[in-house]
């Protein structure tokens, strides 16, 4: 049986691990759009100043900042909004349920980023290092 006290001491580290994984996965979306790696044919010829291009900038820069845990709360808040907008612009017109309109990932990212906006970066982050030095 799990001892809740022993689980609680690991919570900041698990939060940090979740943040690192989500940041890495998210920055890949921006990398595919802007850098062409990994190559996804639908992003060939993407204009930087289009909505998809601007989303790519947010995904690449924001995903990197989330990955390293720098400015986590404000960046996560912005990315949560970006994913909510992406859902309502690109997926919601295809139907009410995310499983039917292929919007599950946008919804999931939106709420995970919203969680990070409130919970912070956790351990293993630049935010935690800078906060220790300023206290």
Outline where the language-model segments fall.
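Membrane-interface interhelical connector segments
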Residues: 34-52
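Extended, low-polarity transmembrane helix blocks
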Residues: 1-35, 52-57, 61, 68-135
């Amino acid at each position: 049986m799990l001892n809740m006290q022993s689980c609680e001491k690991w919570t900041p580290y698990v939060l940090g691990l979740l943040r690192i994984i989500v940041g890495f996965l998210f920055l890949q979306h921006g990398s595919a759009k802007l850098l062409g790696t990994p190559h996804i044919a639908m992003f060939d010829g993407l204009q930087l100043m289009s909505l998809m291009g601007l989303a790519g900038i947010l995904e690449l820069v924001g995903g990197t900042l989330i990955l390293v845990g720098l400015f986590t709360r404000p960046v996560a808040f912005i990315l949560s909004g970006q994913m909510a907008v992406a859902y309502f612009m690109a997926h919601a017109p295809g139907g009410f349920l995310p499983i039917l309109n292929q919007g599950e990932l946008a919804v999931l990212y939106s709420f995970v980023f919203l969680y990070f906006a409130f919970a912070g970066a956790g351990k293993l982050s630049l935010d935690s290092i800078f906060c220790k030095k300023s206290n």
